[in-house]
Amino acid sequence: MSSIEKVAVIGSGVMGSGIAAQVANAGIDVILLDILPKEGSDRDAIAKGAIQRMLKTSPAPLMHQRNAKRIRPGNVEDHLEWLAECDLVIEVVIENLEIKQALYRKIDQHRKASAIVTSNTSTIPLAHLVEGMGEDFRQHFAVTHFFNPPRYMRLLELVAGPDTRPEVVSTLRDFGDRMLGKSVVDCKDTPGFIANRIGILWMGVAVRFAFEDGLTVEEADSIIGKPMGIPKTGIFGLLDLVGIDLQPHVESSMLATLPEVDMYRDIHRPSAFIEKMIAQGSTGRKGKGGFYRLNRTDGKKVKEALDLKTGEYHPANQSTLASVEAGRKGLRALVEHPDRGGQYAWRVLSHTLSYAAALVPQIADHIHAVDEAMKNGYAWKWGPFELIDKLGPQWFAKKLT
């Protein structure tokens, strides 16, 4: 197992800069490269700008601002020869197969013989990424899928190909665990790997059934939240956080690579309501609001929620669903409650948990890996199989029928 003493990150967007920051936090020197800017004379302006944003971003990607000094900015036109100094090159560019493969060919010309190359892809299978690449490149290639923000989200999904050398895998696992403080989960080379494969279906059913069952945004989030061991953002708050406009892209990428027979294909429905929100710029926290927004009334900030029927905002209300109160007694009490909240909880949980169960061993060899991925990638308190245990496996199987 070789050591990683210098790293290159190619792509200085939100994820790339976050990964570079976490590597720097580990006391490792980082080269951060990006494309040339369209305007201006500073050819390194994009990477330099990313480093400056690290110093201002909240929550802070850097443990201390001095760690920024470990990051050397550059560009992919002038500085690819710097890769010869690096033990690990992490690609974090746009999710476009042609762009990634063209970059790999350039990386292969400059990397040293022992250097490992990884991709932070979340949707493109490893087998597609290395198609047409030489044997040595394939032997030193893997997927290292970080979650945003990289400093705070503990999951690192590690995917090896059939040609990836065992020592490459062990080096990456040790680096992720010991140096970056990650929970490293071995995944199979399947669409969305583990966390996003399950997470995208979960988000899809939670949104679709909220519309179908006539729940308000506040009611849905009160169910898809503490009662299920999911962060208080719930489902609609989570979409606001990650960016509503990203969902159609993630969904289309997933649909392009999923098997022909898959539950997600059956439940996926494009939402005209959400498409209209995106067109209006209501993309969540980074836009002019989303399912929630902060509005100023009489000099005070007021949290408002979107009406899923009218598309108008109103002051956000606490949920009065009796099922939420019942959920304090346990998960089964929640899903057995007869009100629309209890019915909604069961529809979301039954689809999500049965989907997760059906994917083993397709996406991972062990159910523990699935639980760890959802807990550390989506911040669930319990993984899918732990949720089944809380409900009771026999009870759950019987209720499904």
Briefly describe each language-model feature range:
Residues 1-401:
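N-terminal glycine-rich phosphate-binding loop for ADP-containing cofactors
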